[in-house]
């Protein structure tokens, strides 16, 4: 088992990475929570696989469990689902001494975490991510959010959990496309870190190679993200580097109208931001092909879909990374050498036009 300690200004907790940890969840939870009501929030994809196991584990450990299921998919990151979950918590008389356990991928983690952060001004939270994407990204760092029609993650909070439990064994139930999606976030982390982490990706030459390497790749990604979060919990400085690939990625994902998974859109964003900054003389052109090779090895998309650059620029104006009159971008001058770069909102259409012209 790998234990990664996270110490922020308001909370100290552990991220436990262990094969078959779901079968020991009751024991793990009793180390941070006393007996209480627990709302296990899951979705229609994950629930049939793991809700009973988690319920049995928690019940045997002395917890009173209520399973609350939301529809699978990004559409559940909505005000209507927030209202539904809060109504269920209230009807079941959940108090501030009770807790929420998020059992699912990034959507469930974001949604359940946000609900936990606002119900009664905050109740206890545990994250149990079940997708590779959530295990390496959204379950770590305390970001919670729902979407608005104008953009992703525009309403949310910073809310740290009491515990994160990551079980790489459950990844065997994921289809290849979801494994590849999560790997896109691993490539992002490795590109930011460089060194041995980046070199380790050369062994991943297909989707099939992800599973055997998953425990080590997850641990490296989580350790990196935990270090960044501890240094900058509320994204005022270096935590912004974790948005590498997400500026273009979020816009493309929204405009693709459900045709792209989050990690797929980020993969496109990683390659295209390298291409964009190379066109402006701030990054070597070789970096684009380097990242592209790592992503294409598992079948991730890297090319821009058929959407207008003006539409992408319009979406970016609502990006949460806009500060004043500028949108903060992340680019690499080399693997392991990230930088922040503000672009005026009024210049976004021109920059996107430049990107489309060199694509």
From Swiss-Prot:
Its Gene Ontology molecular function terms? 3-dehydroquinate synthase activity; metal ion binding; nucleotide binding
Q: Which UniProt keywords apply?
A: Amino-acid biosynthesis, Aromatic amino acid biosynthesis, Cobalt, Cytoplasm, Lyase, Metal-binding, NAD, Nucleotide-binding, Zinc
BP terms from Gene Ontology: amino acid biosynthetic process; aromatic amino acid family biosynthetic process; chorismate biosynthetic process
Report whether Magnesium shows up as a keyword of the record.
Answer: no
Per its UniProt record, the required cofactor names are: NAD(+); Co(2+); Zn(2+)
Which principal EC class is assigned to this enzyme? lyase
Q: Where does Zn(2+) bind?
A: 185, 246, 262
Which Pfam families is this protein grouped with?
DHQ_synthase, DHQS_C
NCBIfam families with a match to the protein in the record: aroB
* Protein name as annotated: 3-dehydroquinate synthase
Taxonomic source organism: Lactiplantibacillus plantarum (strain ATCC BAA-793 / NCIMB 8826 / WCFS1)
């Amino acid at each position: 088992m790998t234990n990664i300690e996270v110490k922020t200004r308001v909370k100290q907790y552990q991220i436990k990475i262990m094969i078959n940890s779901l079968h020991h969840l009751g024991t793990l939870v009793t180390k941070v929570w006393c007996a209480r009501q627990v709302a296990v929030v899951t979705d229609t994809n994950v629930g049939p696989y793991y809700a009973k196991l988690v319920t049995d584990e928690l019940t045997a450990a002395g917890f009173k469990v209520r399973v609350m299921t939301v529809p699978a998919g990004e559409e559940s990151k909505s005000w209507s689902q927030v209202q539904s979950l809060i109504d269920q918590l209230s009807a079941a008389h959940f108090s501030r001494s009770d807790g929420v356990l998020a059992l699912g991928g990034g959507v469930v983690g974001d949604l359940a975490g946000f609900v936990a952060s606002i119900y009664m001004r905050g109740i206890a939270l545990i994250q149990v991510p079940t997708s590779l994407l959530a295990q390496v990204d959204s379950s770590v760092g305390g970001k919670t959010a729902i979407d608005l029609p104008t953009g992703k993650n525009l309403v949310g909070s910073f809310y740290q959990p009491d515990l994160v439990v990551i079980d790489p064994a459950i990844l065997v139930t994921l289809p290849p496309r979801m494994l590849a999606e999560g790997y896109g976030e691993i490539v992002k982390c490795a590109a930011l870190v460089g060194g041995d982490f980046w070199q380790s990706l050369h062994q991943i030459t297909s989707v099939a190679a992800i599973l055997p390497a998953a425990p080590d790749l997850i641990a490296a990604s989580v350790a990196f993200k935990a270090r960044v979060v501890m240094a900058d919990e509320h994204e005022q400085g270096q935590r912004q580097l974790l948005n590498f690939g997400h500026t273009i990625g979020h816009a493309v994902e929204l405009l693709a109208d459900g045709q792209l998974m989050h990690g797929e859109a980020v993969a496109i964003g990683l390659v295209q931001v390298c291409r964009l900054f190379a066109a402006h003389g701030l990054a070597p052109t070789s970096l684009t092909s380097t990242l592209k090779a790592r992503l294409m090895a598992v079948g991730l998309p890297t090319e821009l879909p058929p959407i207008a650059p003006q539409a992408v620029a319009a979406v970016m104006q609502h990006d949460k990374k806009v500060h004043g009159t500028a949108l903060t971008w992340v680019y690499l001058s080399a693997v392991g050498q990230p930088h922040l770069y503000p672009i005026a909102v009024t210049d976004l259409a021109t920059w996107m036009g430049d990107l489309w012209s060199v694509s």
